[in-house]
Amino acid sequence: MTDVEAAALELHRATLSNGLRVLIAPDPTTPVVGVSVHVDVGFRSEPEGRTGFAHLFEHLMFQGSESLEKLAHFRHVQASGGIFNGSTHQDYTDYFEVLPGAALERALFLEADRLRAPKLTVENLRNQVDVVKEEIRLNVVNRPYGGFPWILLPPVLYDTFPNAHNGYGDFSELEQATLEDAASFFDTFYAPGNALLTVHGDVAEHGVDGVLALVEKHFGDIPARPTPQRPSFAEPVPGSERRQSVPDAHAPLPAMAIGYRVPDPSTEPDSYLAHAMLASVLTDGEAARLQRRLVHADGLVTDVSASNGLMGGPLDARDPDTFTITAVHPSDVEPDRVLGAVDDELDRLAAQGPSVDELSRQSARWASALHREDDRVMFRMLGLGARELLYGRAELALELPARLAALRPEQIAEAAGRLRGAGRAVLLVEPATDQSDQEENS
């Protein structure tokens, strides 16, 4: 989607009597339509003692409903030539389908049906606990650098359970989950007033008013329930450096992650976006600062990357969130040499800022990446829905390229100085010499 097309995208909002918020974004340039439900619950909202429950419940939502047996949801979407999925994030869980425009009502029925009454049974619960455990074994326990840095870094940088715990899931706590836990989680967090429905794409057959009528038809009779009060997850920024080492029996080389707190995007949006641009100036492309210094000039690392946001792109989580720099380095390179070089480059950027050409190059990279993502209805829909749920402004997803392009060198310099002036977390991953050195999550 071009900047002109994005600017012309109309956003229509409504709220049903049960509290469900609705966002409709027609796009006549595509033959498909996307339907998504964003629920305002993620890793940070799950109860202590039930680590991984938000992720587990995402799986349960695909196990049938009171109206449809297990796998029926899959068959209905695939028979329409569509795709579907779901994912759990720090502050939300999303579910979506993308289908030909003529299949819009089918997608609305499917999402409403499971939001009304998912099939919560002991069999489904036990089955999905096993599925999640196997997923964790595959992606974390038995994988080199598994959970690096998004699982391993937060407990070094943060102190509170919501921000520090492993949202993917803890085996022992998952195994203790009961059907009553699942029912309580659904009743509390999956209330209509705690969710947002987004419809984006080809709605020409119905028009906006027709889509709203279909939404009312399928979602309007879901009973209203109290909307949970969203707690603040704020906690103080560390006053000094924190450091921790973890063994990894599968890692061929040592690795390190440096974590910093970033500004709150709801109160300091430009400073937050300057940190996103700073990450690109540091590591995106062969000409980026840390690529030139750490990889090519000094040979201190074999790979380096930076990100503004622990799990996703810009504006994918509420405050607090994390700026990360990760690197893999040879065994004979001391971590403090890498840290010193990173600090040198941040100091230079804080003192002088990036050049105009450097900033222009990274702005172009951002614009290209965001436009490529926006070319797909699925990503555009999920971006609109997430920003509407988290910040009340889906428009933020459309404004990102222009707002990033408008950043000035002095704003990037300020972001670099802010990182140097704050406490940070340093996570060191050390290849374990023996499998027994690796802590098993089983």
Locations of regions flagged by a protein language model:
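N- or domain-start disorder-to-order transition segments that initiate the globular core
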Residues: M1-P31
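Histidine-acidic residue clusters that define the catalytic metal-binding segment
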Residues: T2-R13, P154-A195, E205-H206, G210, ...
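C-terminal regions of mature proteins
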Residues: T2-V4, L196-G201, L349, D357-S442
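Active/ligand-binding-proximal structured segments within catalytic/core domains
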Residues: G19, D27-V77, L153, P269-L282, ...
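Acidic/histidine-enriched segments that form metal/cofactor-coordinating
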Residues: V39, S65-E66, K70-F185, D344, ...
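Short acidic/His-enriched helical or mixed secondary-structure segments at domain edges of catalytic enzymes
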Residues: K133-L152, A234-L253, H296-S307, Q352-L398, ...
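An aromatic/glycine/proline-enriched structural segment found at the starts
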Residues: D159, N163, G167, A191-P192, ...
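A structural supersecondary motif
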Residues: A257-R261, T283-V328
